[in-house]
Amino acid sequence: MTSILIYCPNPTPRHDYIFELFFRMLLGVDYSYTPNVNEAMVNYSHKKNESFHIVPYGLLDEFSIRTDILDEISFETSKMITAFFKTVGGSCQFDLFSAAFFLVSRYEEYLPFSLDNHRRFPAEASVLFKNNMLEEPLINQWAIFIRQELTTNFEISFPKMKFTYLSTIDIDQAWKYKYKGIIRNILGLVRDVIRVNISEIRERIQVFLGIISDPYFNFKWQNEFHLSLKTQVIYFILLGKYGSYDKNIKPSNPHFISLIKDLDSLSYARLGIHPSYVSNSNPIQLSKEYQNLNTIISGSITMSRQHYLIHAMPYTYRQLIKLGIKEDFTLGYSTHIGFRAGIASSFYWFDLTENIKTDLLLTPFCIMDITPMYYRSETPEIAKKTIESLLNKVQAVDGTFVSLWHNESLSETDRWKGWRSVYVHLNKLANDIIFSE
């Protein structure tokens, strides 16, 4: 394996973390430090030489969290790349390593900000949104720039990195009507009558008479479709108690248990826990849901995604690590498409308050079903164009395109009529890209 020699006089845990991200994870090569600046391929110091030189901004030398750092962020474009933390005298006019660290560490989410109505960090508060960069996989672009600079100046080769696609599906409600109990169904029917929702009343009655299938229970169609394209899927299962934001049926329901076991047996699918809305502030409830799922599958779940994408730095990730979770898929926005951490690849979580890299792998998603349908008010046909644009950007940097859907959004009912075709379109496009490379 190719190894990149880096001159960095006093490497810290932040240096180690970001060099591993760029060279091992994004570029597929190894790296090591050299005490001799003249033999370095990458010079990350204030000394000048003929190698690829990035002048440090200073963020990686620090050990604390600075509350004034947002005032220092200004995006500019130089040598066809857009970045921040501008420096003078190097091969690149920015400290890309510090900029990348700021983004993937989610530095800004440790700073004071106004929570949204679900106690989340809002997209509008992010530096990427404020600078119209949210829809760009910047760090992947910077990695390609570094690769080009190194291959120009040195006789080294990099392995070919490939575009990958992953479909993730949250099961918030496995059934729309069935197995929810008499009381919930009566209350639902009363609500529909009060709202004069004739279509819901008709659909509910038809489901219970066996005339039509429950629209949310579309897993047979999903299975046939995913098998036809050999799509890799992760299902995240909500097992929380019934509440204002947790609407699934009881985890003890035998039909629900049977569904979970069926999904776990699929060759192309993996399962993860979908911690309930209330569990984010209740570690006992979180542990109970996790153990319930482990018991059902007679195994050990290692993946998660927070319900409603609720997570707080660093509390939520620390709780997941204690639980035994190895990979989390929460990072993204429901209100906006794009790259919350400025990257279209998985990366390890760096705990800023402890100033250490952890073993928790974060896999961000770039589009969620509700975003084009509700927040962008797009038709299915326009949403397909939106997805194509994002796919092209991820393909261009050999990244990983992760989408977030629900069995509800594949139901072809109510507000989701026509949206199954969007999911089909996305998966076929991604499949074409994979098999064309």
Where are the model-predicted features located?
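Terminal accessory/targeting
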Residues: 1-254, 345, 352-437
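Catalytic domains of cell-wall/extracellular-matrix polysaccharide-remodeling enzymes
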Residues: 37, 277-356, 414-416
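Conserved hydrophobic/aromatic pocket- or pore-lining residues that grip, position, or stack substrates
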Residues: 170, 274, 320
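Metal-dependent polysaccharide deacetylase catalytic core of the NodB/CE4 family, i.e.
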Residues: 173-177, 198-200, 223-311
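Glycine-centered flexibility motif
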Residues: 271-272, 336-340, 399
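Short acidic/histidine-rich active-site segments
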Residues: 272-274, 330-332, 404-408
